[in-house]
């Protein structure tokens, strides 16, 4: 009999997104509700080339305690979603920092650090 392996998910309070690409990006939060259905929050506003902005779930209507990931809406391009997921803990100072680079149709979203 195999015993299940449980991995502890990191709790975070927000994301930051740095735009290193030649396009306008908008940070959003993808989250799972109690039924396991995926939703997208509103966006945190335009992030222009060279800018870094917070993507704060508490300001985007994301329920505390849900499983979240960073979703980036790329204006006139291909959206991107982070491969990493976290548990949202409202008020936590822990931040997952990301950068997006490339072009509208060929971009890469990368995790820089969590802390």
Indicate where each model-derived feature is located.
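Intrinsically disordered, low-complexity segments enriched in small/polar residues
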Residues: 2-115
